[in-house]
């Protein structure tokens, strides 16, 4: 006797659609707390796979406020800058290093395996969340890694800040560091603030000390890409020394005229040794996303 099942067949597309419907229904039936626990578990497994013993120093994806929210990109960003520190900046294991805008440790992680006990790493940031996170994870394991929050005003990142950037003196003595790093800091600062910070960098650097600072630089090439719509950032609002993506909140992202930046360096006595242009504006040949300016204190 036939049950009529011989004609009930599914093609691959139908089977796939049915499977997706079942999975969608299953997800709807799982309570939210269980979903969150599963997500945390999978996230921790992924961290362990990517970072090994350093996994406790890596924030959750939703905590990565200082760049792309992806574990793979967090790892890639850190490794990329670590190579730049060594190959371009000549960073040695026993140096005194200042990281202005240290974030949540994106560029700090590889340094824990490179800087020795004679080295000193000082990081500061306007974001208290990142500073507290790094203090808890890094400083407890590596006593020569220090982090502090600076209560400096920034319209985008710290609108309630107590001090104006032009008033803030870095909390270090003159010639305290042989290497200073600023990643994606001057891309969020107005001209007067940038000039003051650059002077402070010069002050805290030793003679012959180096600094690496990232920018969005305006020159003939980048302007051509911007005006043709190829740039990843729509720097449409033009001012005397810079362009920005927002007239109301220019600190959201600022690109400076390369010539103006070069003049600031010359005026202070910072000799630009190398300039590597980034991919941000749509150029095809680049080293990193932002433009990198490497200079030495004369």
Language-model-derived ranges and their functions:
Residues 100:
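Conserved beta-strand/loop positions that form the S-adenosyl-L-methionine
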Residues 184-185:
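Short catalytic micro-motifs in class I SAM-dependent methyltransferases
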Residues 112, 116:
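Gly/Ala-rich phosphate-binding loop of Rossmann-like dinucleotide-binding domains
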Residues 190-191:
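Helix-capping/helix-break motifs at membrane-protein junctions
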Residues 181:
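A conserved beta-strand element that flanks and buttresses the S-adenosyl-L-methionine
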Residues 195-207:
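A short glycine-rich, Lys/Arg-flanked "PGG" loop and its adjoining helix->strand segment in the class I
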Residues 2-12, 16, 20-24, 28, ...:
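Class I (Rossmann-like) S-adenosyl-L-methionine-dependent methyltransferase catalytic domain
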């Amino acid at each position: 006797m036939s049950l009529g099942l011989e004609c009930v067949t599914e093609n691959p597309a139908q089977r796939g659609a049915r499977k997706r419907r079942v999975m969608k229904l299953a997800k709807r039936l799982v309570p939210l707390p269980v979903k969150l626990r599963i997500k945390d578990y999978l996230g921790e497994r992924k961290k362990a796979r990517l970072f090994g013993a350093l996994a406790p120093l890596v924030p959750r994806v939703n905590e990565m406020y200082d760049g792309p929210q992806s574990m793979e990109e967090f790892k890639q960003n850190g490794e990329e800058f670590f190579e730049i520190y060594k190959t371009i900046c000549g960073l040695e294991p026993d140096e005194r290093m200042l990281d202005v805008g240290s974030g949540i440790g994106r560029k700090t992680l590889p340094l824990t395996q490179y800087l020795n006990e004679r080295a000193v790493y000082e990081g500061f940031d306007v974001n208290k969340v990142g500073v507290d996170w790094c203090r808890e994870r890094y400083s407890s394991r590596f006593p020569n890694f220090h982090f502090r929050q600076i209560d400096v005003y920034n319209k985008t990142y710290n609108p309630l800040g107590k001090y104006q950037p032009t008033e803030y003196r870095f909390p270090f003595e003159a010639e305290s560091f042989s290497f200073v790093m600023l990643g994606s800091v001057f891309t969020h600062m107005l001209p007067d603030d940038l000039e003051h910070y650059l002077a402070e960098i010069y002050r805290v650097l030793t003679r012959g000390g180096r600094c690496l600072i990232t920018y969005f630089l305006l020159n003939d090439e980048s302007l051509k890409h911007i005006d043709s719509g190829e740039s990843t950032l729509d720097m449409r609002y033009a001012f005397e020394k810079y362009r920005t993506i927002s007239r109301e909140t220019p600190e959201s992202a600022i690109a400076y005229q390369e010539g103006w930046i070069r003049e600031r360096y010359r005026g202070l006595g910072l000799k630009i040794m190398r300039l590597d242009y980034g991919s941000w504006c749509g150029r095809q040949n680049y080293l990193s996303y932002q433009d990198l300016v490497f200079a030495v204190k004369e």
